[in-house]
Amino acid sequence: MVTVGNYCEAEGPLGPAWAQNGLSPCFFFTLVPSTLMALGALALVLVLPCRRRDVPSGTEELFWAADSRVAPYALQLFLATLQVALPLAGLAGRVGTARGVRLPGYLLLASMLGSLASACGLWLLVAERRQARQSLAMGVWMKFRHSSGLLLLWTVAFAAENLALVSWNSPQWWWARADLGQQVQFGLWVLRYVISGGLFILGLWAPGLRPQSYTLRVHEADQDVERNQAQSTDRTSTWRDLGRKLRLLSSYLWPRGSPALQFIVLICLGLMGLDRALNVLVPIFYRDIVNLLTSKAPWSSLAWTVTTYVFLKFLQGGGTGSTGFVSNLRTFLWIRVQQFTSRGVELRLFSHLHELSLRWHLGRRTGEVLRVVDRGTSSVTGLLSYLVFNIIPTLADIIIGIIYFSMFFNAWFGLIVFLCMSLYLFLTIVVTEWRAKFRRAMNTQENITRARAVDSLLNFETVKYYNAEGYEVERYREAIIKYQGLEWKSSASLVVLNQTQNLVIGLGLLAGSLLCAYFVSEQKLQVGDFVLFGTYITQLYMPLNWFGTYYRMIQTNFIDMENMFDLLKEETEVKDVPGAGPLRFHKGQIEFENVHFSYADGRETLQDVSFTVMPGQTVALVGPSGAGKSTILRLLFRFYDISSGCIRIDGQDISQVTQISLRSHIGVVPQDTVLFNDTIANNIRYGRIAAGDSEVEAAAQAAGIHDAILSFPEGYETQVGERGLKLSGGEKQRVAIARTILKAPDIILLDEATSALDTSNERAIQASLAKVCTNRTTIVVAHRLSTVVSADQILVIKDGCIIERGRHEALLSQGGVYAEMWQLQQKGQETVSEDSKPQDIA
């Protein structure tokens, strides 16, 4: 009968690793299978959530063709299956040749872990082939290679078989083939070498992932539908683009350009290493105190040991390393680094938002964008803190604990700690990955809820106009209910995770404590060793209890980073060409030559638009709504790039000069003036930030708003409110004119600047605008034709084309579209005048 003896051949700890001219078999066959099992589990965790769940529909026929690459994949599958069975066959061989000898425990561990690791590789091999078939069926292009986790697993397995050769001269191994047992083990090693080598070579080729390995028939009518379905599936694992995310984080971990902060980072990393040493030394000194007390040691030795223990405990903190002197010092020093990180991320995002095009901003909700910025900033700082000072130290403590118990106690203790910690981490990652979809859905609904509230409050007046308060509250209530439903799912899944973690920790502590108590009763360990084990394990489990929280927070931050990365990946639509120089302004001549432009929908907004504005002239753009008048102004300001043609200022193509220099010469007075939630003075000063108070007042006087400002209780320091809602329409328009006067541009663009005002305000502001436009090249978009009768040239635009051009009198004499528009507006004014006359009720 075969029985199991000590973990290693000789009773005692796992080490030394090197003995008798070779690696210790106990050490080798503990390290290698454990490493392979860890790699296999990690590969499963990272690859499983990333697998596409789409499957080909019934309108597709997918079958394997008899080509030259089916055989290599069949060989690969056969070798992977053999690799699963071989460790168990090796154990059976040892049992058959043992002949009454007690087998060491490490052989059982090596067989089980080796077989499980190979099973992970086999499952990944089949899963990746299935994913490749489904991806190609959807029309999704993919790289025909295995995942990094699977390749790493096969590489390490093959490297381990080669590593065994360094023990060729060791009598502990089977190279001599002196008896049947050694001959069997040598034969199994040859099989392992051939199998692992074959899988390594075939893995680099990946024959099962090649498109030639099968024939796909897809009905063309369904192909686009399936591709769209593939693109609309749920987002993949939070570990997608992990390398890119970590590279971004590392750039903020090491504060470039600040030697002082770099030195602080090094100090913090050193303090983190000191914390790891304290976590080992504190239980050791506690054990020594117990042993000294039980052995009735002299007071001098006991006092010194107790003093040292208390000092180390002071440095470490309350058993978790979270409240000790070292940890608090590290937290204090890290504040500046964290502020540097937060500032860098916020500035990068804010700068990127201003670099994006007007087209992008018009298609986004401001509330959602700001939420993405807030979450992205907090996610980067949180990730740095959790990864550097929580996750990495916790993993380091686990590895140190496994090594310590294996070397100084017994390999069974190291095995218990390893299995318990591995199972804990594996279940934590798997369950948390499962929870990720609930968190994502909750985040999406939170964005919707926030955007709905912001949209309603921004349109406060409109809500009041239509007595829609109840409707808005009901919409908001429905959004909150949806959010809370998703929040409940996320919280309930958290309870499942916590209970799973608690069960694993309890079982591991029970097994280790019973084993330690047994060895103490057998007098193989001292009472102090039992105390050390309990103290160390409890100390190890304390941060491990938080590992689930750390992982969840990291995953949450990665989820929050996804939207931030999407935002950062938005390409700038309008950007300066390489080598662009400043605009050299001379007189201000504007030329549009055969300009074509279309928005994202593909419909051409402007078609072959050509005109010239001479220096100092005023050109008016008139026509029906949607004709493309405002688009011309936006193209000149370069909010968009034209599809074809050319726009020049003083003979220079505006696409070849810097945007900053171009816009510094252009002033815009829009129809809907939006002011910042700041003082009137600062809103005017926005035209030229460096302007003094006297210049601001002079601009206000020129715009005809100085006296109105002085009538306010706080004068120029009056807050205008969000979007300038505290000012009337005419007052806001005059502030915008004053802002433009202060900028003193060479070219003026007026986009229906007075169309939303009453007649009296319109006339007053027209007078102010006339002062601004004197001796400046001006383009006016006008709705009321009476405001542009004195323009040097009037362009009539319809459906993106210039259909008429000339002065007011010439266009009237032509009797075309302009004359018709003029007559309609004149009749409208006459009707208003008649309606406004007092009537006799009697």
From Swiss-Prot:
Segments forming domain ABC transporter: 590-824
SMART domains (alphabetical): AAA
Membrane topology per record: Multi-pass membrane protein
Subunit record text: Homodimer.
Transmembrane segment boundaries: 27-47, 73-93, 107-127, 148-168, 186-206, 264-284, 306-326, 376-396, 398-418, 500-520, 530-550
Broad EC category: translocase
Swiss-Prot/TrEMBL GO biological process terms: cellular detoxification of cadmium ion; heme metabolic process; heme transmembrane transport; porphyrin-containing compound metabolic process
Name of the coding gene: ABCB6
Region (Required for ATPase activity): 1-236
Domain ABC transmembrane type-1: 265-556
Cytoplasmic side, ranges: 48-72, 128-147, 207-263, 327-375, 419-499, 551-842
Full protein name: ATP-binding cassette sub-family B member 6
Taxonomic lineage from the root: Eukaryota, Metazoa, Chordata, Craniata, Vertebrata
SUPFAM superfamilies: ABC transporter transmembrane region, P-loop containing nucleoside triphosphate hydrolases
Pfam families registered for this protein in UniProt: ABC_membrane (PF00664), ABC_tran (PF00005), MTABC_N (PF16185)
Keywords: ATP-binding, Cell membrane, Disulfide bond, Endoplasmic reticulum, Endosome, Glycoprotein, Golgi apparatus, Lysosome, Membrane, Mitochondrion, Mitochondrion outer membrane, Nucleotide-binding, Secreted, Translocase, Transmembrane, Transmembrane helix, Transport
Origin species: Mesocricetus auratus (Golden hamster)
